[in-house]
């Protein structure tokens, strides 16, 4: 009977020791993981910035962009996380905002899985299509040449109830929000939609009383 009791105590003691060892190993692993991940959590962006990812870019190009717009340490840690996660950067496309105070871990998630950011596009005192194309080309991925081509395309203009000669009338000076990789055709379509909303029945009737069409009002005002 005594031997049985001692045997049970030994088994219980052995179980407790094994349990303690497992807990110790788990604790060590957790501490190690925390030590490894801590720099990625503590490293933060020092200012708001936007990272542009062109279609078909490379990890090297993205790293250079991060270094240019943040700092070497932040860029290095974000890049490390992206590589470890297996990100295929060539499939990402757009402009991604990294806010001041955002950790390297959060920034990596934004670049890998986050939604692209819309860019505010404000213009006024634009008197020619060339000026508009210049501003749009400086703000978005398509070039000035791409915008000029769309503005001069009869088919593009016809879909917007205009011609290359009067397409400038839909470009109402205001603030808009578009994605960086928007096509010239889609941007013009969105601006045309705003133009239609602006020229509601009330404004159209006021123009009519003056003997003018909406486009003629725009031309006179410019």
PLM segments and residue spans:
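Conserved catalytic or metal-liganding residues and their short signature motifs at active sites
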Residues: 2-222
